[in-house]
């Protein structure tokens, strides 16, 4: 089976309780494989300061965020299989997992899957897009053996 090539960058001070490169690889493969094979991407795990800076610079939001996606747009004439970069903030992921009562690795997996789908062009700005993206995320997460990541939200709003 073809693999998504992951360039993993750990630039956070505390690397305890982070997913392994093999876990990130498996999650990214499952999210990306139906669309592409043999693509390369960067997953950069950062602290709040870097996430905050990037979120402010690129999204105008003055706070750290869980995952930022930077798709790579290659000119048509260039043959390059670079999908893009994910920047995931360790502290935000840990805090959200705790607040939402989710297992930490399940939330890490969700952030990788969510970010990969953004790199593939999915979005959640419009309701219809959000529904499609969340449905796909749920399907991928369940195929990886995790619960529906939106279950608690659906219970609260359903």
Swiss-Prot record:
Biological processes, Gene Ontology terms: rRNA processing
Gene Ontology molecular-function annotations: metalloendopeptidase activity; RNA endonuclease activity; zinc ion binding
Entry-linked PROSITE patterns: UPF0054
Claim: rRNA processing is one of the keywords in the record: yes
Annotated residues for binding of Zn(2+): 114, 118, 124
Keywords from the UniProt entry: Cytoplasm, Endonuclease, Hydrolase, Metal-binding, Nuclease, Ribosome biogenesis, rRNA processing, Zinc
PANTHER family: ENDORIBONUCLEASE YBEY, CHLOROPLASTIC
Top enzyme category: hydrolase
Binding note for cofactor: Binds 1 zinc ion.
GO cellular component: cytoplasm
UniProt-listed InterPro entries: MetalPrtase_cat_dom_sf_prd, YbeY, YbeY_CS
Pfam families for this protein: YbeY
Recorded superkingdom: Bacteria
Subcellular location: Cytoplasm
Swiss-Prot/TrEMBL cofactor(s): Zn(2+)
Gene3D superfamilies in the cross-refs: Metalloproteases ('zincins'), catalytic domain
EC number: 3.1.-.-
Functional description taken from the UniProt entry: Single strand-specific metallo-endoribonuclease involved in late-stage 70S ribosome quality control and in maturation of the 3' terminus of the 16S rRNA.
Similarity field: Belongs to the endoribonuclease YbeY family.
Name listed for the protein in its UniProt record: Endoribonuclease YbeY
């Amino acid at each position: 089976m073809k693999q998504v090539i992951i360039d993993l960058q750990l630039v956070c001070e505390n690397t305890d309780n982070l997913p392994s490169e093999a876990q990130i690889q498996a999650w990214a493969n499952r999210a990306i494989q139906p669309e592409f094979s043999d693509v390369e991407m960067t997953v950069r795990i950062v602290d709040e300061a870097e996430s905050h800076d990037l979120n402010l610079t690129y999204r105008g939001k003055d706070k750290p965020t869980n995952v930022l996606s930077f798709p790579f747009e290659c000119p048509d004439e260039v043959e390059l299989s670079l999908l893009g970069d994910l920047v995931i903030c360790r502290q935000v992921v840990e805090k959200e997992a705790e607040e939402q009562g989710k297992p930490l690795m399940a939330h890490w997996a969700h952030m990788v899957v969510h970010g990969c789908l953004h790199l593939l062009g999915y979005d959640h700005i419009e309701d219809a897009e959000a529904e499609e993206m969340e449905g796909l995320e749920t399907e991928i997460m369940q195929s990886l053996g995790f619960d529906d990541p939106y279950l608690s939200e659906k219970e609260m709003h359903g």
